[in-house]
Amino acid sequence: MKLYNDDCLDVLKTIESESVDLVVTDCPYHICSGCCSNDAVKIGRYTEPGGIFQKRKDSHGNTYMTDTKHVSLCGIFNDADPTTYTKQGKLFKFNDIEFSDWLPDIYRVLKSETHCYIMINPRNLKELQQSCEDVGFVFQQLIVWDKGNATPNKYYLNAYELILMLRKGKAMNINNMGTKNILRVPNIIKTKQHPTEKPYELMKILIENSSNEGQIVLDPFMGVGATGVAAKKNGQRVHRHRNR
């Protein structure tokens, strides 16, 4: 197992081309927690309400797009004074990383006839899939992770997340062809060490289906390391990177 405690955008460029057998990762994307959504608009890559970054105006009428470089964020910061909180909320780290910053290198380091799994939410799915296809990936399947629990809100409870399954080169069968595309794995609740931590059992299914013992699994955004634990227990070699 190799663990790189460094900026994945730098480390990826040092990995040899076509040296990785599988990528499984939960990448950063533009979202926050605790945000309002009353005046969201669709401007380019910034899409629906509910925590997604929005086009805003400051107290002088100047329009800007909220992101991690501007601390102003809908529902969290006051427009007149961007340093003042108006309600509780938090901005997830590394939201300034674009898909185009790392996907070309992911495609480059993967061998031909391999799979890539990327966790994503519904609002960012379209952009991620397009970005993946732009660098050469072929869409294989959309997998649903049924978390089995959800946080109450005013709409239907959000009890699932999506996993975009891609391939490089020709299609390759998964090892357990009886696996359904709805994976019912309970989410981590009480023992969670990271806001977006994924269960070991979920990573285990993906790794066992798309790689074999001794092969190299890459996770450029390792979080608490569930991908690495699953790969190591299954006999694969793993490269894990921590985000900047």
How should these model regions be labeled?
Residues 167-171:
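Short loop segments at secondary-structure junctions
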Residues 1-149, 154, 158, 165, ...:
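S-adenosyl-L-methionine-dependent nucleic acid methyltransferase catalytic domains
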